[in-house]
C-alpha cells in the first residue's frame, strides 16, 4: 500500500504547489507505453544515455509496483475520491485503471480509460497545468500507436472484444475536440494569461497523427488557426514545440510543392534543434537535404556520415558532376529506403538538375553561343543511354528552358542557342 499512498501524497503536494511540470511527470504514462512499444519493435533505446535508460526503467518499475497495489483494491474510485483533491481524483483514478489495463494487455480498455482521464482533466484545466495537457496528449497518441499495433492480437483481452476502432482517428478526435478546444476556447483578452499558450503542444501531437494516417489536409486548418491574430506569436511558445511545429510545417510545404518555404522551415528546425538530439536532427535532414539539393546547395560528406545518411552521398556527387548514370543507379540502389521515408519522388525530380549540370559542362567545352544538339546527344549516350535520340534530347532541353534552369532557345534539330549572359542561372526555388 505504501507505493500507492506515496503516489497520492505526491499528487496532492504538487497540486497544492500548482506545480504543473512536476505533476505532469508524476502522472506520466509515457515511459511505460514507450517501453512496451520498444519491446514490440525490438528497439533498445539506441543512442540514449545509460542515465536516461535507468531513469525510464525506474519510472516503469515504480508504475508496476503501484499497479500491484491498485489491483488489490476493491474500489479504486472511492479510494481516489477520499485521498485526492476533489478536482483531480477522477483523473488519477482513470489513469490508474488505464495503467492496469495496459499491463494486462487490454489495449482497448487502456485507451478508453485514458480518454476518460483527459475528459476529466479538461474540465479543470488551467494555464498552470498546461504541461499536464501536453503529457496527456502525448500519451494518448502513443497509446493509439500501441493499440493499433496490437489490433487482432490482444483484442480478446478487452472488456468488449466486438469493438472495431480506428485508434488514431479516435485519438485525433479527442485531441481536437477536447484538448485543443480547451485551449482555443479561452477568451482572456491578455494573451500572456490565455490558455491558448498551451495550444501548440497539442497541435504538434495532431500533426504527428495526421501525417501517420496520411490526412495532411487537416493540418492546414490547424496552421491557419495557430498563425491567426488571436493566438500568441510562435516565438512565445517553448522552443522545443516551435521546432516540432516548424518541422511539420516544412514537411507539409514539401508535400504542397512550396520548396522555398519548406527549406526555410526545415532549416530553422535543424539549426535550433539541440546538437545532442541526433535522432531528431537526422529526421529533419531527411527532408532538408532534398530541398537544399534543389537549390544546388550540397551538404558535406562528413555531415551525411555523422547523421548516418550515407544514402545521399552518391546522390550529391552525381548532381554535382552531372552524372546521370550514377544518379539513376543510386536511386535504384536505395529505392526502398527513399520510398519508406516518403522522399523518393522528391529526389526523382532532381534529375532535371543533373541534366542541367551535365549540359553546363557541354556548354563550357563548346565555343560560341550555338551548341549543336548532337553534342548533348553524345553526352547523354555516354552518360545514360545509348538509345537516346535527338527528339528526347530536345525535350530535356525544352524542360530546362521552361523551368528557368537554362536561358536560350532551340533551333530544331540543329543547335541550342544560349544566352550571351549567364546562360545557366543560379537555381531559384519555386
UniProtKB/Swiss-Prot annotation:
GO-annotated molecular function: double-stranded DNA binding; RNA binding
Domain of life: Eukaryota
GO biological process, one term: transcription elongation by RNA polymerase II
Pfam families listed in its UniProt record: PCI (PF01399)
Cellular component GO terms held in the UniProt record: transcription export complex 2
Residue span(s) of domain PCI: 243-424
Family per similarity comment: Belongs to the CSN12 family.
The name this protein goes by in its record: PCI domain-containing protein 2 homolog
Amino acid at each position: 500500500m505504501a507505493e500507492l499512498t506515496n503516489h497520492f501524497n505526491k499528487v496532492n503536494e504538487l497540486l497544492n504547489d500548482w506545480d504543473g511540470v512536476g505533476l505532469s511527470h508524476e502522472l506520466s504514462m509515457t515511459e511505460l507505453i514507450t517501453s512496451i512499444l520498444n519491446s514490440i519493435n525490438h528497439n533498445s533505446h539506441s543512442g540514449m544515455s545509460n542515465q536516461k535508460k535507468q531513469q525510464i526503467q525506474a519510472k516503469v518499475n515504480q508504475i508496476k509496483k503501484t499497479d500491484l497495489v491498485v489491483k488489490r483494491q476493491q474500489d479504486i474510485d472511492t479510494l481516489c475520491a477520499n485521498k485526492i483533491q476533489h478536482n483531480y481524483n477522477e483523473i488519477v483514478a482513470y489513469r490508474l485503471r488505464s495503467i492496469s489495463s495496459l499491463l494486462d494487455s487490454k489495449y482497448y480498455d487502456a485507451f478508453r480509460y485514458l480518454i476518460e482521464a483527459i475528459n476529466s482533466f479538461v474540465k479543470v484545466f488551467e494555464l498552470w497545468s498546461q504541461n499536464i495537457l501536453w503529457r496527456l496528449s502525448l500519451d494518448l497518441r502513443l497509446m493509439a500507436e500501441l493499440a493499433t499495433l496490437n489490433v487482432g492480437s490482444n483484442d480478446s483481452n478487452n472488456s468488449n472484444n466486438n469493438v472495431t476502432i480506428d485508434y488514431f482517428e479516435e485519438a485525433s478526435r479527442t485531441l481536437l475536440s477536447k484538448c485543443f478546444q480547451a485551449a482555443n476556447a479561452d477568451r482572456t483578452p491578455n494573451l500572456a494569461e490565455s490558455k491558448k499558450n498551451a495550444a501548440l503542444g497539442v497541435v504538434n501531437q495532431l500533426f504527428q497523427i495526421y501525417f501517420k494516417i496520411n490526412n495532411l489536409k487537416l493540418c492546414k486548418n490547424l496552421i491557419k488557426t495557430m498563425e491567426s491574430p488571436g493566438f500568441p506569436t510562435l516565438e512565445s511558445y517553448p522552443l522545443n514545440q516551435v521546432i516540432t511545429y516548424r518541422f511539420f510545417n516544412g514537411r507539409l510545404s514539401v508535400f504542397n510543392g512550396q520548396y522555398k518555404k519548406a527549406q526555410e522551415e526545415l532549416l530553422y528546425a535543424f539549426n535550433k534543434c539541440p546538437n545532442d538530439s541526433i535522432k531528431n536532427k537526422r529526421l529533419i535532414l531527411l527532408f532538408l537535404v532534398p530541398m537544399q539539393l534543389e537549390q544546388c546547395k550540397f551538404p558535406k560528406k562528413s555531415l551525411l556520415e555523422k547523421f548516418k545518411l550515407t544514402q545521399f552521398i552518391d546522390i550529391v556527387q552525381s548532381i554535382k558532376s552531372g552524372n546521370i548514370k550514377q544518379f539513376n543507379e543510386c536511386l535504384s540502389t536505395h529505392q526502398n529506403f527513399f520510398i519508406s521515408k516518403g522522399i523518393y519522388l522528391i529526389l526523382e525530380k532532381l534529375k532535371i538538375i543533373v541534366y542541367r549540370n551535365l549540359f553546363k559542362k557541354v556548354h563550357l567545352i563548346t565555343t560560341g553561343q550555338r551548341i549543336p544538339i548532337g553534342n548533348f546527344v553524345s553526352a547523354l549516350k555516354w552518360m545514360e543511354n545509348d538509345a537516346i535520340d535527338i527528339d528526347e534530347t530536345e525535350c530535356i532541353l525544352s524542360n530546362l528552358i521552361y523551368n528557368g534552369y537554362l536561358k536560350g532557345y532551340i533551333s530544331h534539330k540543329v543547335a541550342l542557342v544560349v544566352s550571351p549572359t549567364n546562360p545557366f542561372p543560379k537555381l531559384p526555388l519555386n
